[in-house]
């Protein structure tokens, strides 16, 4: 459904707004990378297994296990030790996940005012950190031992952050453009 919206509405709106000479210049979403780590429980093999199972439930795709690049004595971490999991979503699974994220998961975030409008890099990619994975309907609250959170990176073909932000806005991603101060939060 989101894919059809992109093709029918978003492409034409972006062509008008940014004056592209060809439809092929319009930015599109290449892939979505979802990453989750076990955090403090990296030494616990059951926690790693739980991370991989949760990622499978959330994304509908089997994750691959991520490992530590360097040893770190403070975290009791050795090189090549399992840390979590990562999934790269493309094509239909990517569109399905993005639609679920925008329409189901984000409205369930407590005190949510919109995604950070500054979370774009210079190449137009968007990064979103989610503190609780229980916002996804596939995760049962009673079955998780501890909230681990996850990272969602949306990789686009946009040349600038402005183009990428507009693309995601037209797809329905809510952004927090207002500057919240401590007084307005009270």
UniProtKB/Swiss-Prot annotation:
SUPFAM superfamilies: RL5-like. Pfam families: Ribosomal_L5 (PF00281), Ribosomal_L5_C (PF00673). Keywords: Ribonucleoprotein, Ribosomal protein, RNA-binding, rRNA-binding, tRNA-binding. One of its GO terms (molecular function) is tRNA binding. GO terms for biological process: translation. Coiled coil: none annotated. One of its GO terms (cellular component) is ribonucleoprotein complex. Belongs to the universal ribosomal protein uL5 family. HAMAP family: Ribosomal_uL5_B. Part of the 50S ribosomal subunit; part of the 5S rRNA/L5/L18/L25 subcomplex. Contacts the 5S rRNA and the P site tRNA. Forms a bridge to the 30S subunit in the 70S ribosome. This is one of the proteins that bind and probably mediate the attachment of the 5S RNA into the large ribosomal subunit, where it forms part of the central protuberance. In the 70S ribosome it contacts protein S13 of the 30S subunit (bridge B1b), connecting the 2 subunits; this bridge is implicated in subunit movement. Contacts the P site tRNA; the 5S rRNA and some of its associated proteins might help stabilize positioning of ribosome-bound tRNAs. This is Large ribosomal subunit protein uL5. The lineage of its organism: Bacteria, Bacillati, Mycoplasmatota, Mycoplasmoidales, Metamycoplasmataceae. The gene is rplE.
């Amino acid at each position: 459904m989101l894919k059809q919206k992109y093709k029918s509405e978003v492409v034409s709106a972006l062509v008008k707004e940014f004056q592209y000479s060809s439809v092929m210049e319009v930015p599109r979403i290449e892939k979505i990378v979802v990453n989750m780590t076990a955090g403090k429980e990296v030494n616990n093999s059951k926690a790693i297994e739980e991370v991989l199972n949760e990622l499978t439930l959330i994304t509908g795709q089997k994750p691959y296990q991520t490992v530590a690049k360097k040893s770190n004595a403070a975290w009791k971490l050795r090189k090549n030790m399992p840390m979590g999991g990562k999934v790269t979503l493309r094509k239909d699974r990517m569109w399905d996940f993005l639609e679920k994220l925008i329409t189901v998961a984000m409205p369930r975030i407590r005190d949510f005012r919109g995604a950070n409008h500054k979370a774009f890099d210079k190449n137009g990619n968007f990064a979103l950190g989610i503190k609780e994975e229980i916002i996804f309907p596939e995760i049962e609250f009673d079955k998780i031992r501890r909230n681990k959170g996850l990272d969602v990176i949306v990789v686009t073909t946009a040349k600038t952050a402005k183009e990428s932000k507009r693309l995601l806005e037209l797809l329905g991603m809510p952004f927090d453009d207002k500057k919240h101060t401590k007084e307005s939060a009270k």
